[in-house]
Amino acid sequence: MRLLSSRAARVSGPSGSLCALLALLLLTPPGPLASAGPVAAVVRELRCVCLTTTPGIHPKTVSDLQVIAAGPQCSKVEVIATLKNGREVCLDPEAPLIKKIVQKILDSGKNN
């Protein structure tokens, strides 16, 4: 009977590939569950997204606007603007300029 060293030991057959796959899965770190920006990409935590808000922003710098209604995750309405440079900014939904921008978007949606 010949003993193999740990370096020379081999596992053959389907159980060897199964063990290798299992080892690979165990060693693979999980992917990110949320983005670093104010809005989570995959998982949204049960809390407010916006911790601080900006009272105004120039409308020409905004490429997208997202309004999150109050709900179980947050008791206040949140307005998040994605700027043309890719940054996301939380806006104050009570600011007069922001109210005008949101109303203009809502009105244009009704006309379509």
From Swiss-Prot:
Regulation: induction: By interferon tau and phorbol ester.
S-S pairs: 48-74, 50-90
Lineage, broadest ranks: Eukaryota, Metazoa, Chordata, Craniata, Vertebrata
Pfam families: IL8
Function: Chemotactic for neutrophil granulocytes. Signals through binding and activation of its receptors (CXCR1 and CXCR2). In addition to its chemotactic and angiogenic properties, it has strong antibacterial activity against Gram-positive and Gram-negative bacteria (90-fold-higher when compared to CXCL5 and CXCL7).
Organism domain of life: Eukaryota
The keyword Secreted appears for this protein: yes
Name used for this protein in its record: C-X-C motif chemokine 6
PROSITE patterns: SMALL_CYTOKINES_CXC (PS00471)
Keywords carried by this UniProt record: Antibiotic, Antimicrobial, Chemotaxis, Cytokine, Disulfide bond, Heparin-binding, Secreted, Signal
Keyword Phosphoprotein applies: no
GO terms, biological process: antimicrobial humoral immune response mediated by antimicrobial peptide; cellular response to lipopolysaccharide; defense response to bacterium; inflammatory response; neutrophil activation; neutrophil chemotaxis
GO cellular component: extracellular space
InterPro entries per record: Chemokine_b/g/d (IPR039809), Chemokine_CXC (IPR001089), Chemokine_CXC_CS (IPR018048), Chemokine_IL8-like_dom (IPR001811), CXC_Chemokine_domain (IPR033899), Interleukin_8-like_sf (IPR036048)
